[in-house]
């Protein structure tokens, strides 16, 4: 089994006896549950990679729409170090987001691309990650 950035972190990332990367995001969702005031929250996730964070954001139930911006291409040190291909990354993304197809919208491009940026209005989203 290969390492991932959230669910199965590399040994050299470990600084505790538990997965602090996973728990850090869970703690963030707890804070968000206290801060977000609306029922119909929308978010943008820049760099969804394998969809592990997307899975956690979908599972927490705070968002009715999660917009993922991920090109699934280019240079990624984590891919090189852990022998991942972009095809494998996309397959993991698809697996990790499969339960949230009704709220997850994938924008398969770079976050700085004008055609992606033009899809989002500043005042329409409650959280950007």
Regions found by a protein language model. Give the residues of each.
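A short alpha-helical cap/connector motif
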Residues: 1-129
């Amino acid at each position: 089994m290969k390492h991932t950035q959230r669910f199965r972190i590399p040994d050299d990332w470990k600084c505790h006896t538990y997965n602090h990367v996973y728990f850090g995001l869970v703690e963030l969702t707890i804070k968000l549950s206290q801060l977000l005031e609306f029922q119909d929250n929308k978010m943008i996730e820049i760099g969804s990679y394998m969809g592990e964070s997307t899975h956690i954001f979908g599972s927490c139930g705070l968002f009715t729409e999660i917009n993922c911006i991920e090109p699934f291409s280019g240079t990624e040190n984590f891919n090189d170090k852990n022998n991942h291909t972009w095809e494998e990354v996309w397959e993991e993304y698809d697996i990790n987001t499969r339960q949230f197809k009704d709220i997850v919208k994938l924008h398969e491009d770079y976050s700085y691309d004008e055609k992606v940026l033009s899809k989002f209005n500043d005042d329409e989203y409650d959280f950007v990650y």
